[in-house]
Swiss-Prot record:
Listed name of the protein: Glutamine synthetase, chloroplastic
Function of the protein: The light-modulated chloroplast enzyme, encoded by a nuclear gene and expressed primarily in leaves, is responsible for the reassimilation of the ammonia generated by photorespiration.
Family statement: Belongs to the glutamine synthetase family.
Pfam families: Gln-synt_C, Gln-synt_N
Molecular function terms from GO: ATP binding; glutamine synthetase activity
Self-association state and partner proteins as the record states: Homooctamer.
Organism of derivation: Daucus carota
GO CC terms, sorted: chloroplast
Domain GS beta-grasp, chain residue ranges per copy: 79-159
Domain of life of the native organism: Eukaryota
Entry keyword annotation includes Transmembrane: no
EC number(s) from the headed UniProt entry: 6.3.1.2
Keywords for this protein: ATP-binding, Chloroplast, Ligase, Nucleotide-binding, Plastid, Transit peptide
Localization: Plastid, Chloroplast
Length: 432
């Protein structure tokens, strides 16, 4: 198991004088040299790696790399569990580690934990304890072995969900018998922008300057068109290793902007997987010395914003005659447009302008193959008479628990009045 290595920002790689000298490793390059680890102790996993220790310019061995990549699996049953939760802004991810006595397979085997909520904006100083409830487990691509990442949600000591715990309500929605019977699928397209550290300007752009107009950068290759591919690829592999249901990646329309897709995932799993994928991306950009932003419009002007398009279907939508079910769902979504917009991410009004492949934030629309609509239906869905819809309104900084839960609630549990339904159907030219 090869771990993702950070670019080395504190040392340069050179061989000693009696060997061939190679060019130095800068902070923008990945330290990607590995040797298979030969241990005399009995191995508990099939493949192990360690970083190649090289001499720095002063001749000292970089022991930290050896320790960071040390696989302790052959020597102890204990594992490291990284407890991850969402902080006080509703978009920041926090984590801390603890030792668990043996490998686990289910969150119920893990203990609850606590943290200082006054330091994350989630509790007052005189009553600062917030309790972490383990909810989902993923393999840890940084530590390897049997070590794990644990997605948690947050509660008061009395067992009440705190205000930033959006998972709790989503879990209630997805536990409803009607929702369970419809087996809701979600495919989430997470866009993000990579920024140069300390200058708050996109990766690959001259500081304070602008590249050529949009057009050459989407899904492009080349040093003058693609910036940050190493980060995107490292993240892709880390997600696959972790067990995240990642389904693809691509470079986006604005240079320095990327996207990854997660799904199809069922119910609450969609939110768990997106949050874990975001955590991995934060860790990888941290190692790379690059800043990750989920701002929906990081650069003003004639540049695309960053969204989190959410593809959605139910069992009824995927079966014969499903297009009629999709149209009924679109009708319901139109009637709750304001409720959805208010929950679809902060600063989304800067992105949803009606330009740059977006609909206006003030009006609801739908169309087939139209990326300027609120809800897009694909050509294949129209042709086959069944499939899914794409909600193009969510911003890149949306909470996936909120968005997925709201989609299920509006389309499966909420019923409009007959009068409102008729008026909306007429306005949207929907015969339902």
């Amino acid at each position: 198991m090869a771990q993702i290595l950070a670019p080395s920002v504190q040392w340069q790689m050179r061989f000693t004088k009696n060997s061939t000298e190679v060019s130095s490793m800068t902070s923008k390059m990945w330290g990607s040299l590995f040797l298979k680890q030969n241990k005399k102790a009995p191995a508990r996993s099939s493949t192990k790696y360690r970083a190649l220790a090289v001499k720095s310019e002063d001749g000292t061995i970089n022991r930290m790399e050896d320790l960071l990549n040390l696989d302790v699996t052959p020597y102890t049953d204990k594992i490291i569990a990284e407890y991850i939760w969402i902080g006080g802004t509703g978009i920041d991810v926090r984590s801390k580690s603890r030792t668990i006595s043996k490998p686990v397979e289910h969150p119920s085997e893990l203990p609850k934990w606590n943290y200082d909520g006054s330091s994350t904006g989630q509790a007052p100083g005189d009553d600062s304890e917030v309790i972490l409830y383990p909810q989902a487990i993923f393999k840890d691509p940084f530590r390897g072995g049997n070590n794990i990442l644990v997605i948690c949600d947050t509660y008061t000591p009395q067992g009440e969900p705190i205000p930033t715990n959006k998972r709790h309500k989503a879990a209630q929605i997805f536990s409803d018998a009607k929702v369970l019977g419809e087996v809701p699928w979600f495919g989430i397209e997470q866009e993000y922008t990579l920024m140069q550290q300390d200058v708050n300007w996109p990766l690959g752009w001259n500081v304070g300057g602008y590249p050529g107009p949009q057009g050459p950068y989407y899904c492009a290759a080349g040093a003058d068109k693609s910036f940050g591919r190493d980060i995107s690829d490292a993240h892709y592999k880390a997600c696959l290793y972790a067990g995240i249901n990642i389904s693809g990646t691509n470079g986006e329309v604005m240079p320095g902007q990327w996207e990854f897709q997660v799904g199809p995932s069922v119910g609450i799993e969609a939110g768990d997987h997106i949050w874990c994928a975001r955590y991995l991306l934060e860790r990888i950009t941290e190692q790379a010395g690059v800043v990750l932003t989920l701002d929906p419009k990081p650069i003003d002007g004639d540049w695309n914003g960053a969204g989190c398009h959410t593809n959605y279907s139910t069992k009824s939508m995927r079966e014969e005659g499903g297009f009629e079910v999709i149209k009924k769902a679109i009708l319901n979504l139109s009637l709750r447009h304001k409720e959805h917009i208010s929950a679809y991410g902060e600063g989304n009004e800067r992105r949803l302008t009606g330009k740059h492949e977006t609909a206006s934030i003030d009006s609801f629309s739908w169309g087939v193959a139209d990326r300027g609509c609120s809800i897009r239906v694909g050509r294949d869905t129209e042709k086959e008479g069944k499939g899914y819809l794409e909600d193009r309104r969510p911003a890149s900084n949306m909470d996936p628990y909120v968005v997925t839960g709201l989609l299920a609630e509006t389309t499966l549990l909420w019923e409009p009045t007959l009068e409102a339904e008729a008026l909306a159907a007429q306005k949207l030219s929907l015969n339902v």
